[in-house]
Amino acid sequence: MICGMTYFQICLYFLIYSFGGWVVEVIFHAVALGKVINRGFLNGPVCPVYGFGVLSVFALLNTIQGSGRQMSDGMIFVFGIVLATAVELVAGWLLDVCFHARWWDYSDKPFNFHGYICLEFSLIWGLAIVMVVKIFQKYVEAHALHTPATWEWIVIAALYAVYLTDFIVTVAVIQGLNKKLTRLDKVRSDLRIVSDKLSDTLATTTIGTAQKVGEGKVQATLAAAELRDATAAQREKSIEMLRIKRAELQAQFEELSSSITNHTVVGQGRIIKAFPKMQHRDYSELIQELKKRLK
């Protein structure tokens, strides 16, 4: 027993409320955005932050009630706000530190803390916890208080194996996304340099041509004409090479962008689509551009 819950109950509750949180997220954003999106951090239908949030509240309530004290709805509401918000804050901070991105952003909400949490959603957390404790948990406990059979443990173990695999795959996908963003940023930087050089060369050629028209009245010699022709030919060659290089870089940029945005069911495109307010610490502009491509 841990905080009044058996190991089986802890495993079961975490799965149930992770799935329940995912359902709530999908429904909420379907209503808000008008389209159904897999809102989970993982590929499967789970949101771990909800599982951890609800379990933390259950652990505290069981500990307090185990000492003989009763919890009022107001106390449950307050504890729900504090604990669930703390879980959301830690989760948001860890994801930011590990993957250099803020997956949700409350910066536009009043009374927010660094965009990780805000008063509005903390209050929603509190109300949701009261509903879970007073309504839903009664039905869940009715199926979880018995001694689990061997087959039930096997099912739980299989589900957690899938959960762990999904987590490993998702981490690999995000690491791959960050590597591609680094490459995209390098290609975009090179593209700007080449485009600037091309613009400068074209401008120099135009000015040079105007100057040579005036010089032709004074320097009417064959040697000067040949020199001008050679210089013009060299510039044309440079311009053509810069145009080819720019086209190659543009093709690379499009290919890399497509390799991200084409995978919207499972993959890097799904991650960006699932978190429309995601802010990347290093490549914010690129993320915004990729979001536009996914609309």
Name every feature range the model reports, one short phrase each.
Residues 1-295:
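Aromatic-rich, lipid-facing transmembrane alpha helices and their immediate juxtamembrane interface loops
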